[in-house]
């Protein structure tokens, strides 16, 4: 296909395939799972016994696990930030109900919305969490927004989502495994279901970038390199507790994830290597001089970051989160 050189043309070209994208990467609402499928049913006589069993299983989970689970939940609950960010992309007409990209974003958001609902209800029922403290951190995170370096550029936005959806998949997948190791099959199932959603979403955004590379390889390469230079910032990087400064809590949350092995600096490098391979960056030809330099920069970056990852030291002592009762 001939190369297209404007964002509007490229995004319009991709939007022609929106029916296929929605069919391949999102699940029809009628057949999708819902939080109620996994939570105790308050209409049943067994409700109180089921909640008691849930709480007994929750008692077996270690402190850092709760810190990570709450942080993951708050991240999911900050969905309004992510939806408004995507709807604010250049080339997206969110007023037009027939706009292909607005349709994708709304349908993706509808799937993502279940994650925070499920985890938040589990936290409430567990009896292990100060839900007011969690709600305060959630409200702060939504009010503070985020600063991830993409501006309103769809190319940079899709690099970010390709990376971040896979990082989220890894985190939820490993919390599922750890819950299972501690005998909590219910929570393991919840986290695994969320992880599966995140993997589908990752594959979608990865496919969008692949298509953009076919249509506008020079500009897409520059966008990829720019995001790698800036580093992918986690969406909860402004995390804080009541009366805390913006971003004051994120490092403690990240340290807990590192101690558990849920998401590590090595995972960051592994994801980058995977995207470089998936998009065939090292073998891409026909680029202009500037894009070639960007390609070479990206191709050499994982080896450099690997050395830094090996030197990362994580504090051994857990931080006293206000979230955990």
Regions found by a protein language model. Give the residues of each.
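Non-heme di-metal
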Residues: 1-325
């Amino acid at each position: 296909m001939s190369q297209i050189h404007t964002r509007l043309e490229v995004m319009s070209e991709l939007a022609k395939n929106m029916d296929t994208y929605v069919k391949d990467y999102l699940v029809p609402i009628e057949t999708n799972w819902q939080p109620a499928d996994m939570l105790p049913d308050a209409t049943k006589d067994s409700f109180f016994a089921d909640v008691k069993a849930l709480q007994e299983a929750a008692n077996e989970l270690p402190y850092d696990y709760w810190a990570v689970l709450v942080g993951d939940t708050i991240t999911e609950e900050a969905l309004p930030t992510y939806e408004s960010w995507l709807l604010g992309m250049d080339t997206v007409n969110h007023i037009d109900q027939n706009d292909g990209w607005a349709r994708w974003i709304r349908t993706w958001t509808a799937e993502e919305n279940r994650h925070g609902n499920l985890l938040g209800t589990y936290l409430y029922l567990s009896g292990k969490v100060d839900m007011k403290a969690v709600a305060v951190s959630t409200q702060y995170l939504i009010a503070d927004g985020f600063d991830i370096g993409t501006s309103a550029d769809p190319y940079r936005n899709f690099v970010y989502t390709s990376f971040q959806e896979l990082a989220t998949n890894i985190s939820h997948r490993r919390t599922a495994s750890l819950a299972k190791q501690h005998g909590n099959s219910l929570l393991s199932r919840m986290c695994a279901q969320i992880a599966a959603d995140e993997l589908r979403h990752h594959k979608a955004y990865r496919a969008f970038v692949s298509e953009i590379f076919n249509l506008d390889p020079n500009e897409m390469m520059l966008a990829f390199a720019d995001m790698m230079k800036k580093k992918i910032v986690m969406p909860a990087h402004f995390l804080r507790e009541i009366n805390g400064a913006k971003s004051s809590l994120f490092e403690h949350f990240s340290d807990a994830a590192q101690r558990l092995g849920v998401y590590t600096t090595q995972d960051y490098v592994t994801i980058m290597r995977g995207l470089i391979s998936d998009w065939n960056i090292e073998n891409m030809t026909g680029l202009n001089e500037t894009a070639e330099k960007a390609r070479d920069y990206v191709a050499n970056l994982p080896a450099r970051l690997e050395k830094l990852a090996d030197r990362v030291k994580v504090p051994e002592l857990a931080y006293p989160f206000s979230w955990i009762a």
